[in-house]
Design a protein with these regions (language model features):
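Catalytic core of pol beta-like nucleotidyltransferases
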Residues: 1-27, 33-39, 49-104
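Short beta-strand->loop micro-motif that forms the acidic, two-metal-ion catalytic signature
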Residues: 44-48
């Protein structure tokens, strides 16, 4: 299968689509951010927002658009700022900070 867009471009388009006053930061992480993704890799996105209820449905709709339009899967995780700051020294978030690419 020939991919029309690379996954980093898809991630940036997704981030541009979901940017709003309710989202503080959007971070691409994982294999796509590192550049070692494979055919079966998904696109890992961490969204920092204190307004989960206001963005969850819209984010889910945009994930579905990417699945249909680009035939790629986005794994979008929403985390509030307090939880992010409290757990940023844990291994998961340490890796996100080390390898992550800020998209918005």
């Amino acid at each position: 299968m020939v991919r029309l867009h690379n996954r980093k471009e898809i991630a940036q388009r997704f981030a541009d689509a979901i940017k709003s006053e309710y989202i503080k930061q959007i971070i691409l992480f994982g294999s796509v951010a590192r550049g070692d993704d494979t055919e079966n890799s998904d696109i890992d996105i961490l969204i920092i927002s204190d307004e989960y209820d206001k963005i969850k449905d819209f984010v889910a709709d945009e994930v579905i658009k990417v699945i249909f339009d680009d035939k790629e899967y986005i794994s979008a995780q929403i985390m509030n700022t307090a939880h992010y700051n409290k757990t940023k020294n844990f291994s998961f978030l340490t890796n996100v900070q080390k390898e992550g690419v800020i998209l918005g």
